[in-house]
């Protein structure tokens, strides 16, 4: 059975005080995340704060990838990921219909720019870096997660070839990589996603962005041709560090 992942990107309201922001994060980590983890069929929960990448990634994001003009949530400051035994665990009951404990709705209404999607794991590879606590745990200390569509059906096939023949085998050997999961959209705007896990933001920058992601700027490379066919969600790819469970 393929693992499911429920992703929620969001911001907190502009002008919120640092005290109010910390109160929301404390509640999220002390109450909401443990509540989600206790739901039947939910296997892990991980919360990330956006940090951004280096200059090469910023150039890729502004010049190489397409951006949707669809009216979808533009939040990108935080990303909450929930793992499930399968994607269907997020539909029985549906995450849209779930009756939450008293006070939860008021807290969660503080989120703005909300964008939600459910994915199923299409394919995955483990990298050379070990997980913190062995198999079955949530994603690593640092992640990069893109969410996107392709412009044409033919570019869908090229995307599949690229991940199967090049990208996933490459990530399986990359220093600092814990795992990579290619995801297929089940619900939400994004039809595709990819979740890269790294031991640290520094390892991601040194071993992935600077020598590899920057190749998307070279129009003679396969990477550039594939990425030119993508239409990304606002802020995608999300790059951030885990804030819950806390790093050890």
Stretches found by the model and what they are:
Residues 1-248:
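Macromolecular interaction modules
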């Amino acid at each position: 059975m393929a693992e499911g992942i429920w992703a929620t990107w969001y911001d907190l309201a502009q002008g919120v005080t640092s005290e109010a922001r910390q109160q929301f994060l404390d509640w999220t980590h002390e109450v909401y995340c443990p509540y989600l983890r206790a739901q039947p069929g939910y296997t892990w929960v991980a919360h990330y704060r956006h940090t951004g990448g280096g200059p090469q990634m910023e150039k890729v994001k502004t010049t190489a990838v397409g951006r949707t003009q669809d009216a979808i949530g533009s939040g990108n400051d935080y990303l909450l990921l929930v793992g499930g035994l399968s994607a269907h665990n997020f539909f029985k009951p549906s995450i849209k219909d779930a009756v939450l404990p008293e006070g939860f709705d008021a807290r969660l209404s503080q989120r703005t720019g909300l964008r939600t999607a459910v994915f199923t794991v299409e394919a995955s590879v483990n990298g050379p870096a070990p997980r913190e606590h062995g198999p079955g745990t949530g994603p690593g200390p640092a992640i990069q997660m893109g969410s996107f569509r392709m412009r044409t059906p033919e570019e869908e096939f090229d995307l599949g070839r690229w991940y199967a023949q090049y990208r996933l085998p490459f990530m399986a050997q990359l220093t600092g990589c814990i795992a990579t999961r290619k995801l297929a959209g089940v619900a939400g705007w994004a039809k595709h996603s990819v979740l890269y896990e790294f031991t640290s933001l520094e390892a991601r920058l040194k071993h992935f962005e600077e020598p590899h992601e920057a190749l998307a700027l070279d129009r003679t490379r396969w990477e550039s041709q594939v990425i030119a066919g993508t239409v990304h969600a606002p802020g995608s790819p999300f790059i951030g560090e885990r804030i819950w469970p806390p790093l050890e």
